[in-house]
Amino acid sequence: MQNHVISLASAAERRAHITDTFGVRGIPFQFFDALMPSERLEQAMAELVPGLSAHPYLSGVEKACFMSHAVLWKQALDEGLPYIAVFEDDVLLGEGAEKFLAEDAWLQERFDPDSAFIVRLETMFMHVLTSPSGVADYCGRAFPLLESEHWGTAGYIISRKAMWFFLDRFAALPSEGLHPVDWMMFGNPDDRERMPVCQLNPALCAQELHYAKFHDQNSALGSLIEHDRCLNSKQQRRDSPANTFKHRLIRALTKISREREKRRQRREQLIGKIIVPFQ
């Protein structure tokens, strides 16, 4: 298995974390230098996802994250690889990860390398819907189909045909059709034309920040993209036409009823959903 870890060349602490996390398990890996806002990023967007450059809401860091995955896929396709495992540099690995990542016979026995598929290795501790896939369990972990949104791109295996699918799709979409890369890959299943995504359960990996949040702990590594998204979201709210005194007053007066309705909707949305554990 070729394991690629997307990481800024300057991220010494995170690279040390990855070297220790993968090394102690004897898992081979290679760093892929993540993009940041730069001329290189602009060139990559122009070549692969031209609609992304003019996107009005995604920040430069979000665009760089998006393109880091896209450029890595293009590299894998140029090298003729049938599939790759992709990780981000704040990932935590679960028990027996080496049985999945230091070898790939299990993958070839369960998936056709010439088909379009993704094996999602990560959990974000969200409530998600899954359904049986018919894929045999391996080392105590199941491969149900993901039938709902499940954000995050900290760990996944993607086949050559799936990489082609997303790159072709991204290249054709206008700015308004593009969203953060994890939304594009693991958002509404209809948006990816029902391409099969198998959600490993229990999950093999988790992002350190979300693992810490789920367990009410302090994050040791943090997340640049999460911080950037938060700032970007606040700026959008400030710039919104709805951010007037009249609208703010109406929202304040209707807050209780809106909260009740949100709780009711959340209860309905959680029916049949599970939180994929990490172990």
From Swiss-Prot:
Keywords, in A-Z order: Glycosyltransferase, Lipopolysaccharide biosynthesis, Transferase
Presence of keyword Transport: no
Key word Transferase present: yes
Superkingdom field: Bacteria
Protein EC: 2.-.-.-
Record-annotated disulphide pairs: none
Top EC category: transferase
Pathway annotation: Glycan metabolism; lacto-N-neotetraose biosynthesis; Bacterial outer membrane biogenesis; lipooligosaccharide biosynthesis
GO process annotations (BP): lipopolysaccharide biosynthetic process
InterPro entries given in the database record: Glyco_trans_25
Any one Gene Ontology molecular-function term assigned to this protein's record: glycosyltransferase activity
Family note: Belongs to the glycosyltransferase 25 family.
Function (record text): Adds the second galactose to the lacto-N-tetraose chain in lipooligosaccharide (LOS).
Name of this chain's protein: Lacto-N-neotetraose biosynthesis glycosyltransferase LgtB
Organism: Neisseria meningitidis serogroup A / serotype 4A (strain DSM 15465 / Z2491)
